[in-house]
């Protein structure tokens, strides 16, 4: 298997039609749903001004290469400065911002989005896996991640013979598959917490938003449907002679959507952080349930065909590197065209949504 770090990046085609940068609107919608937790966490940090650092160091883990990466970090800086103004604190802090993602991330495209005049803010690219150490011990005040830590460090072992014709957990998967994914998640999330616990100063904070599962039963149909439909598309292409059966049998996506109980248990067991807040929310696959005055988004314009393409393009932006590496790049347009049609059929009979979890943590 090729090095997983090279395959777990988003579609890095700069600002092309299928790039993550141009297909991350759904992530922006999801991020906006969790911003109130981020704001409350920042208010808690500023609440006790005594000892607040003159240089506030923060990190965005899994920043990718689109405009969303800068949206949250700039929002954090603006919020902190506004809170200082409200408290009549004249001397604003300086900021060091570390933008982290895997080495193949398009950092060049990301830094092109930066303003040439950053004032009191200093921004650095930080390539590397967040399942490894990224910064010196006790050097970070705040860490943030949005829709990244549900990605596993590797495909769980032992799936090839147990999960045929599926590319992720599915309702037809045997119990061994669910156990393998859960075990890999527990190991990875515990490692993640331990490493961030080493890097973040005592009393520092961390806010994480990620895909979750609405029920404890891992075979829940709605929570698995997005990848089940992609698997069915590949099965159809095997029948048409467009994909090799062995290639399908040997492919599984390294992702896991935990339930809230698993998240709470992992945080408690690892012990570096206190769980201050946990919230959940849903967003429709095509984001048609979301309206925002700034975006002037009208849910009525989401027809079935557009919804299918929107969902397929979003999934393509986050999965194409690993799919193209395994099945070949020449079938990607055909694959996601067929996938979009299956999405249309699915949404015509079911109103599916993504289930998200957001947590706010304090370093003990």
Curated annotation (Swiss-Prot):
Site feature Involved in substrate discrimination, where: 144
Gene Ontology MF, one: S-adenosyl-L-methionine:benzoic acid carboxyl methyl transferase activity
Record: residues binding Mg(2+): 163, 251-252
Keyword annotations: Magnesium, Metal-binding, Methyltransferase, S-adenosyl-L-methionine, Transferase
Enzyme Commission identifier(s): 2.1.1.273
Alphabetical list of InterPro entries matching this protein: MeTrfase_7, MeTrfase_capping, SAM-dependent_MTases_sf
Annotated signal peptide: none
Residues the record lists as binding S-adenosyl-L-homocysteine: 20, 63, 68, 101-102, 129-130
Classification via Pfam families: Methyltransf_7
Tissues and organs where the protein is expressed, per its UniProt entry: Expressed only in the upper and lower petal lobes. Not found in the corolla tubes, anthers, pistils, sepals and ovaries.
Biological processes annotated in GO: methylation; response to ethylene
Biological role: Converts benzoic acid into the volatile ester methyl benzoates. This scent, mostly produced in a rhythmical, diurnal manner, attracts the pollinators.
Assigned protein family: Belongs to the methyltransferase superfamily. Type-7 methyltransferase family.
Protein's recorded name: Benzoate carboxyl methyltransferase
Gene encoding the protein: BAMT
């Amino acid at each position: 298997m090729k090095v997983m770090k090279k395959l777990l990046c988003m579609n890095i085609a700069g600002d092309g039609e299928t790039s993550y940068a141009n297909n991350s609107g759904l992530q922006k919608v999801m991020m906006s749903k969790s911003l109130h937790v981020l704001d409350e966490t920042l208010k808690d940090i500023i609440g006790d001004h005594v000892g607040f650092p003159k240089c506030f160091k923060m990190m965005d883990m899994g920043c990718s290469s689109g405009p969303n990466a800068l949206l949250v970090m700039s929002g954090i800086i603006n919020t902190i400065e506004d809170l200082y103004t409200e408290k009549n604190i004249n001397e604003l802090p300086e900021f060091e911002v570390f933008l982290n993602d895997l080495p193949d991330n398009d950092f060049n495209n990301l830094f092109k989005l930066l303003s040439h005049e950053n004032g009191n803010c200093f921004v650095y690219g930080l390539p590397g896996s967040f399942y490894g150490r990224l910064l010196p011990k006790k050097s970070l005040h705040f860490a943030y991640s949005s829709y990244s830590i549900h990605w596993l460090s590797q495909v769980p072992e032992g799936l090839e013979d147990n999960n045929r014709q599926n590319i992720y957990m599915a309702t037809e998967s045997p119990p061994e598959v669910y156990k393998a994914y859960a075990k890999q998640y527990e190991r990875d999330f515990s490692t993640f917490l331990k490493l961030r616990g080493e890097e973040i100063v005592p009393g520092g904070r961390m806010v994480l938003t990620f895909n979750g599962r609405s029920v404890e039963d891992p075979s829940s149909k709605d929570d698995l449907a997005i990848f089940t439909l992609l698997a069915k598309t590949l099965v159809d292409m095997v029948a048409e002679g467009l994909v090799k059966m062995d290639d399908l049998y040997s492919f599984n996506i390294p992702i896991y959507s935990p339930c809230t109980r698993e998240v709470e248990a992992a945080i408690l067991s690892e012990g570096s952080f206190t769980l201050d807040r946990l919230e959940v929310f849903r967003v429709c696959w095509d984001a048609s349930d979301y309206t925002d005055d700034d975006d002037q988004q009208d849910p009525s314009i989401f027809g079935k065909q557009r919804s299918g393409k929107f969902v397929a393009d979003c999934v393509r932006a986050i999965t194409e590197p690993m799919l193209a590496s395994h099945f070949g790049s020449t079938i990607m347009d055909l694959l996601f065209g067929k996938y979009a049609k299956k999405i249309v059929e699915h949404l015509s009979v079911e109103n599916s949504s993504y289930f998200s979890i957001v947590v706010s943590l304090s370093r003990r």
